[in-house]
A protein has these predicted regions:
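Intrinsically disordered, low-complexity, positively biased terminal segments
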Residues: 1-5, 118-120, 136-142, 146-268
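Conserved GNAT acetyl-CoA-binding A-motif
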Residues: 115-128
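A conserved beta-strand-loop-helix scaffold within acyl/acetyltransferase catalytic domains
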Residues: 11-95, 238-243, 254-255
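Active-site acidic-Proline motif in GNAT/NAT acetyltransferases
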Residues: 95-97, 127
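Aromatic/hydrophobic pocket-lining residues that form π-stacking "cages" and hydrophobic walls in ligand
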Residues: 111, 135
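Conserved acetyl-CoA pyrophosphate-binding loop and the N-cap/start of the following alpha-helix
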Residues: 98, 102-110
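Extracytoplasmic beta-strand-rich oligomerization domains located immediately C-terminal to a leader/signal peptide
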Residues: 129-130, 147
Length: 268
């Protein structure tokens, strides 16, 4: 599949009908299974309470049917922190056959543009710190940072995605109007400081999770403890770097991140 053609033929827009919300739920089932799917009623609530429901539609599929096929979506909930509105982006999903085509990034960029138009300068979401591909996307491609770690955020689930491990999560903060984010989105990031601290995750962790739960649990606990120690000292995760056999999270004092002036972290 040609990447540039996909970029041209994928339309990103707001979803606003029950049928489109049902399509989002169908994508959840296809990608993650039915056990952890969010029902369509939550999409309705998000739409009517200041959240976002965004869809990615394949225009090429309309040639074979009466309407474009949804191939991805983003669901965000409206929230406030210290009296200021922000968005909690609960999930972004893209069909596997459309991975590595820029669809997820386009959804996030549309989400950012829409939020800024509404006077919102912060979007947060949680992600698995052991998911290294997602970490690269969040920090390197989008310019998010993280300074909060939630152990077992959603509880242990039966989903094969979690391999029976606690659902530990990092909280990504995406400061939409910051110079850091603007520079990274323009492919002009500031170099990481040589003094950055590191939290290492084995490159083959996905395989370990599926074959050796005891080792995976031990590694998860080690990663959790390191993040909690650095965050307690006022550090933030702001990048990732791959090397043979491992990927390193890069952490620096939150007050010194180039192009970003962070408010005090508010615990929720």
């Amino acid at each position: 599949m040609n990447h540039s053609r996909v970029q041209h033929e994928i339309e990103i827009r707001h979803c606003a009908t029950l049928a489109e919300y049902d399509e989002c739920v169908c994508l959840e089932h296809l990608i993650w299974g039915e056990d952890i799917a969010v029902p369509s009623a939550i999409f309705v609530v998000a739409h009517h309470t200041g959240g976002q429901v965004l869809g990615a539609f394949d225009a090429a599929s309309a040639k074979a049917s009466d309407k474009p096929k949804m191939v991805g979506f983003t669901l965000a909930l409206g929230a406030t922190k210290s009296g200021k509105p922000y968005l909690h982006s609960h999930m972004t999903a893209v069909l596997p056959q459309f991975h590595n085509r820029g669809v997820g990034r386009r959804l996030k960029l549309f989400q950012r543009q829409d939020a800024l138009k509404r006077g919102i300068d912060l979007i947060e979401w949680t992600f698995d710190p052991l998911d290294l591909k997602n970490a690269h996307f969040n920090f390197v491609r989008l310019g998010a940072i993280a300074r909060k770690y939630i152990p077992d955020c959603y509880g242990v689930t039966q989903s094969p995605l979690h391999a029976g491990l606690p659902t530990d999560r990092l909280v990504a903060e995406w400061w939409l109007a910051s110079e850091r984010v603007k520079s990274i989105l323009a492919d002009n990031p500031s170099p990481m400081k040589e003094s950055a601290q590191r939290v290492s995750v084995p490159a083959n962790l996905a395989e370990i999770r599926n074959t050796d739960r005891e080792t995976a649990t031990r590694l998860q606990t080690l990663v959790r403890e390191q993040f909690q120690q650095w965050f307690a000292k006022g550090y933030a995760a702001s990048g990732v770097e791959s090397r043979p056999g491992a990927t390193d999270y890069l952490l620096e004092p939150a007050s010194t991140i180039d192009g970003l002036r962070l408010p005090k972290l508010v615990e929720s």
